């Protein structure tokens, strides 16, 4: 009986060792699985964080870009409003020029138009105020033109037109004209005018 008990004890001891070994290996494997899962979870978390940071940066840049665009748009709107105010004020100023400033300007504008037409006889048109001014000083006007051009020019006053001022000059047959009314000149030189106003206002 004693021998049998020893055998049983040995079997139990070996079984216990095997059980402990299996449990130890199982624990190691479980820990390994847990570690791998933790690493995967950490990597996943880091990936999610990086993605969120990237998306946040993209959104930040988008917001900044939109804000800059909106600021630029508002600035341009303000600049345009100010430029329009200046142009409107200029139109009003030109429409109310005193005679001593306006008359030599008419001589200059008519002279430029006559040079462009290359004609010895022209018809000049403008608003009623301007035609009345020229009618009252027609001889002086013709003399000033002759001095400016270095040759005689036959000038006929035409019918009134709608304009704030300046002059429209035509050949007698009305086939060719040069529009030197203030509106037309402002329109022709609007780009240069806007640039000059913008530089004066905004530097």
From Swiss-Prot:
Q: Spell out the Pfam families in the cross-references.
A: vATP-synt_E
Which Gene Ontology MF annotations are present?
A: ATP binding; proton-transporting ATP synthase activity, rotational mechanism; proton-transporting ATPase activity, rotational mechanism
Q: What is its main location?
A: membrane
- Tell me where in or outside the cell this protein is found: Cell membrane
Tell me the membrane topology, using the record's own terms.
Peripheral membrane protein
Q: Which InterPro entries match?
A: ATPase_E_C, ATPase_V1_Esu
Q: Does the keyword Ligase apply?
A: no
Q: Return the GO cellular component terms, semicolon-separated.
A: plasma membrane; proton-transporting two-sector ATPase complex, catalytic domain
Alphabetically sorted, this entry's keywords are: ATP synthesis, Cell membrane, Hydrogen ion transport, Ion transport, Membrane, Transport
User: Would the keyword 4Fe-4S turn up in this protein's UniProt record?
Assistant: no
Gene Ontology annotations of biological process type: proton motive force-driven plasma membrane ATP synthesis
Q: Which SUPFAM superfamilies does this one have?
A: V-type ATPase subunit E-like
Protein family: Belongs to the V-ATPase E subunit family.
- Partners and quaternary state? Has multiple subunits with at least A(3), B(3), C, D, E, F, H, I and proteolipid K(x).
Which NCBIfam families is this protein grouped with?
PRK03963.1
Role played: Component of the A-type ATP synthase that produces ATP from ADP in the presence of a proton gradient across the membrane.
Q: What is this protein called?
A: A-type ATP synthase subunit E
């Amino acid at each position: 009986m004693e021998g049998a008990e020893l055998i049983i004890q040995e079997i139990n001891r070996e079984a216990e060792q095997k059980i402990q070994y299996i449990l130890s290996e199982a624990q190691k494997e479980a820990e390994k699985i847990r570690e791998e899962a933790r690493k995967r979870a950490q990597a996943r978390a880091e990936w999610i964080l990086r993605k969120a940071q990237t998306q946040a940066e993209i959104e930040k840049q988008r917001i900044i870009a939109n804000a800059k665009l909106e600021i630029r748009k508002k600035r341009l709107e303000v600049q345009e409003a100010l430029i329009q105010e200046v142009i409107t004020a200029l139109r009003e100023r030109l429409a109310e020029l005193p005679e001593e400033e306006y008359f030599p300007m008419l001589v200059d504008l008519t002279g430029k138009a006559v040079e462009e037409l290359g004609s010895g006889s022209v018809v000049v048109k403008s608003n009623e105020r301007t035609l009345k001014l020229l009618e009252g000083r027609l001889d002086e006007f013709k003399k000033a033109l002759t001095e400016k051009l270095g040759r005689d020019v036959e000038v006929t006053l035409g019918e009134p037109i709608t304009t704030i001022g300046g002059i429209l000059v035509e050949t007698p047959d009305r086939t060719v004209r040069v529009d030197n009314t203030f509106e037309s000149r402002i329109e022709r030189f609007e780009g240069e005018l806007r640039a000059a106003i913008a530089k004066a206002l905004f530097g």
